[in-house]
Amino acid sequence: MMKIITFFMFTSIIMSKPLYGDKQIYSMLKNHCEMINGFPNLLDIHIYSNKEGRVLQLDIEVDINNKNYVFMGMKAMSLIGQYSKIPFHKFILIEHYPEPKIPSGFESDSDCAINYFVNKKIPENRWIKDCLSNSILQRKIENWSKLNKNK
């Protein structure tokens, strides 16, 4: 009986995915974005909490409105964000255009994005319709984590 319990415990440890803290997630996401061909200029990564939960936010610099940038950014956050010790509630992508154009923001529920980009459990059209929203977003600096304040 003890051998069976030990076997299942050992198997579950091997099969579980590693979990990382905010600094590691930040570093992994930055490296991942830099390795993607055609990924826009990465301005910054923010990890913070709001009333709804934890948020992972990418700020990118773009010259044109290209929906592929939204997919690339959300996919990168999904692939890396799934490994956070404390799960994220939302993924936010802010596209910064040359002056005087106002930045545009996109947000997605993190579980929904992970189910689309990583687990392939939902189709693209459902993710776009049910999970992705396009709006101008404002960050509250007081919500930023210490990691982002000390840059």
What are the residue ranges of the model-derived segments?
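A short linear-motif detector with a strong N-terminal bias
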Residues: 22, 36-38, 69-74
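Polar/charged, Gly/Pro-rich intrinsically disordered segments
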Residues: 26-61, 86-151
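Sterically constrained small-residue positions within well-ordered secondary structures
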Residues: 7, 12, 49, 84-85
